[in-house]
């Protein structure tokens, strides 16, 4: 029997998959903070602290990038280039040594951030939601199956703004590896198929404005193009 709803329903957010007609349904978006040493330093951290995570709505996704509108209520809008992981299997208390078995594939993502609102939250002991979780705050490339590329743990991760390089690092510079992140998250949540993890950004984050063109890439994974449009 078909389910009836009291209001109009909505489509499940999803990502295209390289070489496939099927799409990857997105359930939740977890994001890790300060996971590259140099970025940790530029944000005021020091050392291998416990990983910490925040959530973005799955409806913040912008599949395959394209046009992203400058958000409201900010004058300090930042990019953060990240390796994105999509899970095919869930579980609790996942062993880091077997965590790769849970991964469907990888993508290039941007954790777009209203830095001034994030900083206000930090300064006042408030949540970061207004700074991190808002419309169009998670542009993401097509997902590449791990069956095709394996599990990248090294390779360049970079971002150019208007043709000028702003971020450049290597995936091996991560403080917490992808398997370690999955294992840690699974101690606090029951992970599910369709969960997505943004695995942290390297140093070089900075502001952008309407008209700017962003090109992000990760060796062996792909590229993501975004153009900033004026606020709606």
Locate each region found by the language model.
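Catalytic-pocket segment enriched in acidic/His residues
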Residues: 2-23, 39, 45-47, 115-232
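General beta-strand structural signal in soluble alpha/beta enzymes
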Residues: 54-56, 63, 79, 108, ...
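Extended, compositionally biased flexible segments
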Residues: 2-103
